[in-house]
UniProtKB/Swiss-Prot annotation:
Keywords: Abscisic acid signaling pathway, Acetylation, Cell membrane, Cytoplasm, Membrane, Nucleus, Protein phosphatase inhibitor, Receptor. The modification N-acetylalanine is found at residue 2. The keyword Membrane applies. It comes from Arabidopsis thaliana (Mouse-ear cress). The record marks 115, 182 as: Involved in interactions with PP2Cs. This is Abscisic acid receptor PYL1. GO terms for cellular component: cytoplasm; nucleus; plasma membrane; plastid; protein phosphatase inhibitor complex. InterPro entries: Plant_def-hormone_signal, Polyketide_cyclase/dehydratase, START-like_dom_sf.
Length: 221
């Protein structure tokens, strides 16, 4: 498995001329401090910038997690098991010869009550060294057309504080606005789902970290 892989599709020149770049690196998410945002701005510009055309919208969300980035990344990188921390996923199926690398796919079944039943998703980016991953929705029964997402995991450390190491997770997306919906409605729905997922990710990985610390303490004794 390669540490860093990515792929992209060519963009039509006429379409490209009508697009504008997102400015997520200039707008601080509400869950970040100014110091965190300053340190993350370069990564946001690099990994969380999209080209927007008519009928498209995008957003960036952040989650602070009181656990080391290695622990958080061990969960986030599992393209084959999104249900570990993602709400509303009933099951995820991959092929028998599945290998986690750019281009692999998963078939996700969504719980009832959402405007979706199934989703086929493709791994677009996986960089274990920089802790970056991304996927796009390529098919299925849902309303999120041309959905593309990137998630990055970032380490923070302050020696003078008791809790020296923590993690910030950034997740962004770009998607078509469904017919009959506004950009605001589309962002509200997608943001809510992602925010719930990130909160669950924090809960799970913080518990993992506590268990690791307890085990280490027991061994020391």
């Amino acid at each position: 498995m390669a540490n860093s892989e990515s792929s992209s599709s060519p963009v039509n020149e006429e379409e490209n001329s009508q697009r504008i770049s997102t400015l997520h690196h200039q707008t601080m998410p509400s869950d970040l401090t100014q110091d965190e945002f300053t340190q993350l701005s370069q990564s946001i510009a690099e990994f969380h910038t999209y080209q927007l055309g008519n009928g498209r919208c995008s957003s960036l969300l952040a989650q602070r997690i009181h656990a080391p980035p290695e622990t958080v990344w061990s969960v986030v990188r599992r393209f084959d098991r999104p249900q570990i921390y993602k709400h509303f996923i009933k099951s995820c199926n991959v092929s028998e010869d599945f290998e986690m690398r750019v281009g692999c796919t998963r078939d996700v079944n969504v719980i009832s009550g959402l405007p979706a039943n199934t989703s086929r998703e493709r791994l677009d980016l996986l960089d274990d060294d920089r802790r970056v991953t991304g996927f796009s929705i390529t098919g299925g029964e849902h309303r999120l057309r041309n959905y593309k997402s990137v998630t990055t995991v970032h380490r923070f450390e302050k020696e003078e504080e008791e809790e020296r190491i923590w993690t910030v997770v950034l997740e962004s997306y770009v998607v078509d606005v469904p017919e009959g919906n506004s950009e605001e409605d589309t962002r509200l729905f997608a943001d809510t789902v992602i925010r719930l997922n990130l909160q669950k990710l924090a809960s799970i990985t913080e518990a993992m970290n506590r268990n690791n610390n307890n085990n280490n303490s027991s061994q020391v004794r």
